[in-house]
Design a protein with these regions (language model features):
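Short hydrophobic alpha-helices and adjacent helix-cap/hinge residues
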Residues: 1-318
Length: 318
């Protein structure tokens, strides 16, 4: 019996370091937390799809800014100090901090911005450097959202764009250009922190904006309920890029399936952990975009959705 106990002890002692060595260590940087981010579970599911089991063959070192963007640089440096095999950053609000923190550790990002225009990489087909991942945008998405809004409410002549200046995207500028073509005045509503939302909506109401287009960012997504509540209070239509917004009361949304795209980020993680170089892995881009229309919201604002537009919708919320 004693021999058996000693043998078991020897097996545990010898194999424990091997098990630890077999684990890939992946840092994760979030704008919120695993509990508050509505899409982080999709990334975890993507890892599971590829055979990764947390605690067995992969260890996730997660750091979340809890909605406080000023914490991101310190958290990024903390993750780099852990010397993980790779770091995953969820969100365009987050990616610049991790890029600034390391130029050697491989980074995979999921961002709703153009990585080239934002200065994250040199090109989508061949990023170069230590960053690759998925981008959730294409060049004409902002223009199409405004176009769909005009088809739904042709009389609209004033809209505002709610955006985060710390999120280096170009949705406001693209909407501004589209507005000039469609005869719509476009107002800028910059929101640097959560406390600015009330003031932004008051400014929109004072300018008699008839609709607000919510630019894509983690900051906006994590504060979706507050934004939809403010829109209802001021009776201003909302338009955004992700289906959950329409489900929460926005008039319409147009964009890719956010969870599916983020889930696919795990493929890049897997390839890099198996030896691929991030700079040689092309950025993935969505090829399918969903139009979701909320008929309840349309009726509440006295709008009739044209049959031609309803027929093109991927989902209609009755």
């Amino acid at each position: 019996m004693r021999r058996l106990s000693l043998l078991l002890f020897f097996i545990v002692v010898v194999t424990a370091p091997l098990t630890a060595a077999a684990q890939s260590r992946v840092g994760v940087l979030l704008y919120g937390t695993p509990a508050t981010d509505p899409n982080f579970a999709s990334f975890r599911a993507g890892l599971a799809d590829l055979g990764y089991v947390e605690g067995r063959n992969i260890l996730l070192e997660i750091r979340g800014a809890e909605g406080k963007p000023e914490r991101l640089p310190d958290l990024a440096r903390e993750l780099v100090g852990l010397k993980p095999n790779l770091i995953y950053a969820l969100g365009g609000d987050v990616a610049p901090s991790i890029k600034s923190a390391t130029s050697t550790i491989p980074i995979v990002v999921s961002v709703s911005l153009d990585p080239v225009q934002a200065g994250l990489v040199g090109g989508l087909a061949r990023p170069g450097g230590n960053i690759t991942g998925v981008t959730l945008v294409s060049s004409d998405l902002a223009a199409k959202r405004l176009q769909f809004l005009k088809e739904t409410a042709p009389a609209i002549s004033r809209v505002a764009v709610l955006w985060n200046p710390a999120h280096p995207d170009f949705e406001y500028k693209e909407t501004l250009v589209a507005g000039q073509r469609l005869g719509v005045a476009v107002q800028s509503l910059e929101v640097g922190n959560v406390g600015d939302f009330d003031a932004a909506f008051r400014a929109a109401a004072a300018a008699r904006a008839e609709a607000i287009i919510v630019a894509s960012s983690r900051q906006m997504l994590l504060n979706r309920q507050q934004i939809t509540d403010l829109a209802a209070r001021h009776r201003i239509l909302l338009v955004s890029g992700w289906g959950p917004w329409a489900e929460s009361g926005a008039l319409l949304s147009y964009g890719p399936d956010l969870n599916a795209i983020i889930r696919s980020s795990a493929i890049h993680v897997d390839k890099i952990l198996k030896g691929a170089k991030p700079g040689e892995l092309p950025f993935e881009q969505p090829t399918k975009f969903d139009l979701v229309i909320n008929l309840r919201t349309a009726r509440a604002f006295g709008l009739t959705i044209p049959q031609s537009l309803a027929a093109r919708a991927d989902k209609v919320i009755e």
